């Protein structure tokens, strides 16, 4: 056990080294926020996979495999499908825009208006809650491993994430993500999967001891599968944390191929996690909580030392998600929300900062770093004061998908969509989501039963889609000049639009 703890501790110290290394490469705001838009296929694939495969995919995926068998892979598979769709269908467009935030895309597509403003505040809430949830997840592992109090675990683990994120921004996060991607790959595929199968007696032994439902594709239930697709697949298509990784690609081709590779990796990761959970179920059926299965396997089925690598893999998955969410929150705050609060225009005429217009001064770089530190401190405070922020994250996620999805994706795929329709679809979708959630919560038998229900997001999505289509057809089309600038920039890049 001491060796396992040492391995995890060495990993944590190593993350600080990557932070310092990244600091030497971050010479401009573009370097700091999107790694200079210079990531090649290998780095891009690794960082994209690392940011989407958090604690839910790693610890949660193994737990679902323990409880439901192969169908437990659906949660992570839904994440992978989301990455695949984003990469194949939209990543080349996003890479050509050379922007920093989702709201900037809305300004480019619809022109100035309330739609981009509304999305900024939702994205900020979503990324803060995502970072706080991930921070609480790896802090819980530290509580068990090191015997620390929760607040100390949050401060130490969160302090490390905050330090390397603030030092070099996206460059530090990319380098750390690549290390985390390698640790996750080795820990899950090369160590946990074969050793767990060996301890279970192999695939044939698992088939003998487990019921047929463990080998069924829908053992988890069709309703759960649909929910995973709606929440995770659709959410990944529009999340600022994921889009910001797309913006780091060296070219539209890298964004497309590298992202698609990451999506396929995620699906394989989900299947591997489910099989590990099934192997653990073959060995013992006495693990009371499914979220404890990953740690149980690392400590009981793996040799000392190898278990430490597996635990480091779990911590790596959670830290990569937290760091990505923190820099996403700071980017939204500084790029979108501050100008709104100050009543200022956006950085450029069309609302997006182009490569040539990216601020290069030391003061601008220091400001970016300051916002990472400030919002990172907010995240640590949330993780300490509110031990369970899952309900808040669920609300933010439901608003993200139920309120914003149609306006964002509609703008990418339908030229007739208008800014007025986008704004009102956000309003109606959000009201529908929160209204349904509130009604269900008031009539729920248990606290937060309404918050965690599936119906709010369905109602929000349906209402948002109806309003978007009807108002787009009923209102004046988008200004031809705005639409033409969008067409040129989205198809040929920012240089062609100048």
Predicted feature residues:
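Membrane-embedded helix-loop-helix hairpins and adjacent transmembrane boundary segments
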Residues: 1-498
């Amino acid at each position: 056990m001491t060796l396992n703890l040492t391995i995890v501790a060495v990993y944590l110290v190593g993350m600080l080294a990557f932070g310092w290394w990244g600091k030497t490469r971050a010479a401009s705001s573009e370097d700091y926020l999107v790694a200079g838009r210079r990531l090649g296929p290998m780095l891009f694939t690794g960082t994209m996979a690392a940011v989407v495969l958090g604690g839910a995919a790693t610890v949660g995926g193994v737990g679902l495999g323990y409880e439901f068998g192969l169908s437990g892979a659906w949660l992570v598979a839904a994440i992978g499908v989301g990455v695949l769709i984003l990469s194949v269908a939209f990543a080349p467009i996003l890479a050509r825009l050379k922007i920093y935030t989702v709201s900037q895309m809305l300004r480019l597509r619809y022109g100035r208006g309330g739609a981009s403003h509304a999305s900024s505040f939702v994205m900020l809430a979503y990324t803060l809650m995502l970072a706080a949830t991930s921070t609480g997840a790896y802090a819980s592992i530290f509580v068990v491993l090191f015997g620390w109090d929760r607040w100390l675990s949050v401060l130490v683990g969160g302090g490390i994430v905050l330090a390397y994120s603030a030092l070099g921004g996206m460059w530090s996060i990319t380098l750390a993500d690549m290390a985390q991607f390698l640790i996750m790959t080795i820990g899950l595929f090369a160590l946990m999967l074969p050793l767990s199968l060996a301890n279970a007696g192999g695939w044939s032994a698992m088939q003998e001891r487990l019921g047929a439902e463990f080998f069924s594709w829908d053992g988890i239930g069709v309703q759960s599968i649909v929910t995973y697709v709606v929440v995770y697949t659709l959410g990944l298509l529009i999340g600022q944390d994921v889009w910001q990784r797309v913006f780091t690609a060296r070219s539209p081709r890298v964004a497309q191929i590298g992202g698609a590779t990451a999506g396929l990796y995620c699906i394989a990761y989900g299947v591997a996690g489910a099989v590990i959970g099934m192997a653990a179920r073959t060995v013992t059926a006495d693990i009371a909580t499914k979220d404890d299965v990953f740690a149980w396997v690392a400590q009981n089925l793996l040799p000392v030392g190898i278990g430490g690598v597996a635990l480091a893999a779990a911590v790596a998955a959670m830290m990569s998600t937290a760091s990505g969410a923190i820099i996403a929150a700071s980017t939204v705050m500084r790029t979108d929300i501050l100008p709104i609060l100050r009543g200022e225009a956006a950085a450029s005429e069309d609302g997006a900062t182009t490569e040539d217009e990216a601020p290069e001064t030391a003061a601008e770089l220091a400001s970016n770093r300051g916002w990472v530190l400030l919002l990172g401190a907010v995240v640590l405070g949330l993780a300490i004061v509110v031990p369970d922020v899952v309900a808040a994250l669920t609300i933010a996620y439901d608003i993200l998908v139920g309120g914003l999805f149609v306006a964002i994706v509609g703008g990418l795929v339908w030229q007739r969509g208008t800014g007025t329709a986008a704004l009102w679809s956000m309003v109606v979708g959000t009201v529908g989501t929160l209204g349904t959630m509130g009604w269900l919560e008031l009539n729920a038998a248990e606290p937060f039963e309404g918050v965690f229900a599936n119906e709010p997001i369905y109602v929000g999505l349906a209402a948002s889609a109806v309003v978007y289509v009807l108002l787009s057809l009923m209102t004046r089309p988008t200004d031809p000049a705005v639409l033409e600038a969008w067409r040129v920039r989205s198809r040929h890049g920012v240089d062609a639009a100048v």
